């Protein structure tokens, strides 16, 4: 056939080559993604504009519902107004009240740095591991086993007294007829306390320990706590020296608070120990339990 009837002369629409098809699909997908991104940005801008028009007391309540890390790392970068609110005391006082860290109705002027108070309060905990011997000697280092060495015993123990100050304390460490010592070193930065806070605010570091003896033997106790620099230089120290423990079995607390210790503190080294004063084989030396190190708001 010739003319229009010739199959070879009939024109057919061109098909895209395999190489061209993915490019066209990719271009369409990119265009859709761009449209979605622009729509999201527009929604975010509208939301920010809406929040910017809120009265300050209402905006503070909205911001107070957000996680603290988002407030510091993201919200304060939105605009100057938000930065001032995040850096100001009222927002953090409100967060403290909402989370039960301070009573409702606390006055703004009672504390200058509510943001620091908030972060310190959220981190507040005993930084010593295994303070009562529930995990034997786990967490303790530089352990000296004088005489028959340390032993973990159940309260009240032989010729001892119950620990009535805290019902959760069930065990204690008993020392022997020569000095038994053990220590822990706390890395404050690893525990969440940053350099600027430690160097500028210098929050109080509170150390506590409980010790007792037996009713049938005399004993000695000692505690040494040092604040160390990054190079482990001693920047502050508290030491009891050797303390004679009364032979009545009662539990006694010793406490010390480090304040105004200067910049550079990065570690806390806690060391305590005991022995008996009659040199009897066994575990007649001082007993220790419920030791603690706290960074206070």
UniProtKB/Swiss-Prot annotation:
InterPro entries: F-box-assoc_dom, F-box-like_dom_sf, F-box_dom, F-box_only, Galactose-bd-like_sf. A carbohydrate binds at residues 214-216, 279-280. Changing residue 281 to A: No effect on carbohydrate binding. Residues 117-297 form the FBA domain. It is a peripheral membrane protein. The keyword NAD does not apply. The keyword Nucleotide-binding does not apply. Component of the SCF(FBXO2) complex consisting of CUL1, RBX1, SKP1 and FBXO2. Predominantly detected as heterodimer with SKP1; the heterodimer with SKP1 is not part of the SCF(FBXO2) complex. This is F-box only protein 2. The lineage of its organism: Eukaryota, Metazoa, Chordata, Craniata, Vertebrata.
